[in-house]
Amino acid sequence: GPSFCKADEKPCEYHADCCNCCLSGICAPSTNWILPGCSTSSFFKI
């Protein structure tokens, strides 16, 4: 099944709707332009 991001609990299989769980603990939308350092293809379970 899909992984979930603690910030919004949206399934990460729905790429455009899920958030990026950065190593810093900050989560951002996959379409986020402000935090481009966050991966848009890999999601961390936190």
Curated annotation (Swiss-Prot):
Family annotation (Gene3D superfamilies): 4.10.40.80
Main location: secreted
Entries under InterPro entries matching the protein: Conotoxin-I_CS, Toxin_19
Disulfide bridge positions per record: 5-19, 12-22, 18-27, 21-38
Intracellular or extracellular location(s): Secreted
Coiled coil regions, renumbered to chain: none
PROSITE patterns reported for this sequence: I_CONOTOXIN
D-phenylalanine sites (modified residues): 44
Residues carrying 4-hydroxyproline: 2, 11, 29
Post-translational modification: The natural D-Phe-44 form of the peptide is more potent than the L-Phe-44 form.
Tissues where this protein is expressed: Expressed by the venom duct.
One Pfam family recorded for the sequence: Toxin_19
Molecular function via GO: sodium channel regulator activity; toxin activity
Any single Gene Ontology cellular-component annotation: extracellular region
Keyword Secreted: yes
Domain of life: Eukaryota
Keywords annotated in UniProt: D-amino acid, Disulfide bond, Hydroxylation, Ion channel impairing toxin, Neurotoxin, Secreted, Toxin, Voltage-gated sodium channel impairing toxin
Misc. remarks from the entry: Negative results: does not have effect on sodium channels Nav1.1/SCN1A, Nav1.3/SCN3A, Nav1.4/SCN4A, Nav1.5/SCN5A and on potassium channels Kv7.2/KCNQ2, Kv7.3/KCNQ3, Kv1.2/KCNA2, Kv1.3/KCNA3, Kv1.4/KCNA4, Kv1.5/KCNA5 and Kv1.6/KCNA6.
Family (UniProt): Belongs to the conotoxin I1 superfamily.
Role according to the record: Iota-conotoxins bind to voltage-gated sodium channels and act as agonists by shifting the voltage-dependence of activation to more hyperpolarized levels. This toxin acts on Nav1.6/SCN8A > Nav1.2/SCN2A > Nav1.7/SCN9A sodium channels. Produces general excitatory symptoms upon intracorporeal injection and repetitive action potentials in the frog cutaneous pectoris muscle. Natural peptide (with D-Phe) is active on nerve, but not on muscle. Synthetic peptide (with L-Phe) is not active on both nerve and muscle.
UniProt comment concerning the protein's domains: The cysteine framework is XI (C-C-CC-CC-C-C).
UniProt protein name: Iota-conotoxin RXIA
Organism: Conus radiatus
